[in-house]
């Protein structure tokens, strides 16, 4: 899409993915990229100015620090890391390297979010007392249990594990479903929550909460071998408002009839925004029946 950008190299531990994606690049650009199975060798390529890190979450810290050491600009997929300690290491490396580093909170690029934020900041819905944030993902439901096996042919499983604990290969812990295991990720909260909570914090200009409390578990699918909660509620306490995150795997019945979104609940109305658009739900003055906000 950008004529000033060339995709000259790809790296993946899976030969099947490398073959498919390199063909995709060739179909789009007319040029076949150089392929690597070890990202460190890709970083040695002096013709590369910038890299996109789209590895499983447990690899982000090492990938980013090594890319900065190789003098590359970086776009790193969310979540930035799996721990505060890793994030601190990545921030320090980014500040010292003085390269361009962006984390994939791309949801902010949706025009509806900026429109909703401008309306929120106008004060028309009054004092915000509660922000609700949610993701109900029906398509993230039951996962069949599989026995451990040898890794598929063409997969460098040792490199895939990287800094994660050594264990036998299991189909459920590989590719997209790695998200449901603590060794590699944090479940639906770190997959969808980082997007939705980012919008909530942006709207409220909020940073560190005073306290956080959470409750949840594997309530819907207790017998499958995944580890992260399929149901979760988390309360973030701030000085003059609270934020509530909630998620559920396997069902779509979220707040306001939406499977995902953010709601800013004010004294005069509520702003609800998600990837499909935004709306304002007005409150009434029950003394005279009038709406409490103006468009």
Where are each of the predicted segments found?
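N-terminal glycine-/serine-/threonine-rich beta1-alpha1-beta2 phosphate-ribose binding loop
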Residues: 1-76, 82-100
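Structural recognition of the beta-strand scaffold that forms the well-ordered cores
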Residues: 7-11, 52-53, 75-76, 82, ...
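Tryptophan-centric aromatic hotspots in well-structured domains and transmembrane helices
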Residues: 18, 59, 75, 88, ...
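Short, solvent-exposed loop/turn segments at the edges of secondary structure
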Residues: 69, 94-96, 155, 175, ...
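A contiguous active-site-proximal alpha/beta segment in oxidoreductase catalytic domains
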Residues: 73-75, 80-159
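Rossmann-like dinucleotide-binding domain that binds NAD(P)(H)
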Residues: 158-241, 251-255
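Short polybasic amphipathic segments
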Residues: 262, 276-285
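Conserved small/polar residues in nucleotide/adenosyl-binding loops
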Residues: 293-294
């Amino acid at each position: 899409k950008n004529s000033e950008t060339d995709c000259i190299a790809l790296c993946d531990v899976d030969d099947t993915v490398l073959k498919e994606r390199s063909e995709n690049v060739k179909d789009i650009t007319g040029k076949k990229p150089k392929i690597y199975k070890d990202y460190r060798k890709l970083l040695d390529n002096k013709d590369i100015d910038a890299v996109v890190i789209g590895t499983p979450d447990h690899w982000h810290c090492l990938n980013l620090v090594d890319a900065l050491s190789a003098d590359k600009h970086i776009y790193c997929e969310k979540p930035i890391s799996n721990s505060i300690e890793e994030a601190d290491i990545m921030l320090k490396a980014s500040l010292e390297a003085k390269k361009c580093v962006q984390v994939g909170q791309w949801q902010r690029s949706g025009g509806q979010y900026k429109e909703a934020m401008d309306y929120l900041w106008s004060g028309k819905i009054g004092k915000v007392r509660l922000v609700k944030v949610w993701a109900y993902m029906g398509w993230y439901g039951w996962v069949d249990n599989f026995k451990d096996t040898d890794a598929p042919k063409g997969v460098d499983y040792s490199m895939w594990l990287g800094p994660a604990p050594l264990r036998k290969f299991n189909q459920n812990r590989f590719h997209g479903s790695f998200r449901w295991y603590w060794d590699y990720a944090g479940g639906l909260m770190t997959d969808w929550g980082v997007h939705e909570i980012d919008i909530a914090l942006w709207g409220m200009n909020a940073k560190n909460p005073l306290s956080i409390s959470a409750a949840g578990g594997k309530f819907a699918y207790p017998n499958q071998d995944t580890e992260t909660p399929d149901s979760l509620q988390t309360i973030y306490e701030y000085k003059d408002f609270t934020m509530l995150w909630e998620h559920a795997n396997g069902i779509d019945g979220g707040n306001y009839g939406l499977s995902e979104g953010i709601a800013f609940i004010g004294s005069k109305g509520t702003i609800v925004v998600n990837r499909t658009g935004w709306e304002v739900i007005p409150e009434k003055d029950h003394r005279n029946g009038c709406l409490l906000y103006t468009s």
